[in-house]
């Protein structure tokens, strides 16, 4: 479980001038906020959408006074912070609540692998070292979570690095954290990124482990609650 910032401000989404900036309105005042999710989010960031902002903890040279934390759509809270899944994975690993990684502990983060960096290296007594790459998922259609919501050459490269590590005797896993509660299963987004879709199937066939988890989100906390089926 990860705690969200206290005293979130409910506002109405107006526009997204660039990938990392959101303009929202509250009681007639325009608020400019940083968005820590570079995805397209076109099915979420619709005019009039209910968003939740947190005052920036440090101003410094920032151009925005707020951070976008959540969006609420049809009663479902959705986290819009693509950095959060790594914290969720680390917390669940430490709590021993991730069945595929029982007996493992965190050894390192941002681990060099070929021309990339992978999120985690795990170790455990009597277990082979395990490299893990975590991906944030926000797009869900009719209970089916889809990744990615925009083409991601980086995502395909990470999968190829995991395949190379597995071929050298390491465990290698891609973990998709669905930052909402209404997903039943996860699949690659074939239409948006056919290259990633074919690469993840190739990776799974080569022995890379693929997992997906959905989250429970409220205005106070976010927690991983259950694995969901992965459809490749």
Curated annotation (Swiss-Prot):
* GO terms, molecular function: DNA binding
Q: Which HAMAP family match?
A: SfsA
Which NCBIfam families does its entry note?
sfsA (TIGR00230)
Q: Which InterPro entries match?
A: SfsA, SfsA_C, SfsA_N
Q: What is this protein called?
A: Sugar fermentation stimulation protein homolog
Belongs to which family? Answer: Belongs to the SfsA family.
Coiled coil ranges: none
**PANTHER family for this protein:** SUGAR FERMENTATION STIMULATION PROTEIN A
């Amino acid at each position: 479980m990860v705690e969200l910032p206290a005293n979130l401000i409910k506002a109405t989404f107006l526009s997204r001038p660039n990938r990392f900036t959101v303009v929202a309105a509250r009681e007639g005042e325009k608020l400019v906020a940083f968005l820590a999710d570079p995805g397209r989010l076109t099915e979420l960031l619709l005019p009039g959408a209910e968003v939740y902002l947190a005052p920036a903890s440090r101003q410094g040279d920032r151009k925005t006074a707020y951070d976008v934390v959540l969006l609420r759509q049809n009663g479902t809270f959705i986290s819009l912070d693509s950095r959060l899944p790594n914290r969720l994975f680390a917390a669940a690993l430490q709590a021993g609540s991730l069945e595929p990684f029982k007996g493992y502990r965190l050894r390192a983060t941002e681990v060099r692998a070929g021309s990339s960096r992978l999120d985690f290296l795990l170790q455990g007594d009597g277990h082979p070292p395990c490299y893990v790459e975590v991906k944030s998922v926000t797009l869900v259609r009719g209970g089916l979570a889809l990744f990615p919501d925009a083409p991601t050459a980086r995502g395909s490269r990470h999968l190829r690095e995991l395949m190379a590590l597995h071929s050298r005797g390491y465990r290698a896993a891609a973990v998709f954290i669905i930052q909402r509660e209404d997903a039943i299963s996860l699949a690659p987004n074939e239409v948006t990124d056919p290259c990633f879709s074919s690469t993840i199937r190739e990776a799974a066939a080569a022995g890379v482990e693929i997992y997906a988890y959905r989250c429970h989100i409220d205005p106070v906390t976010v927690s991983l609650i259950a694995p969901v089926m992965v459809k490749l």
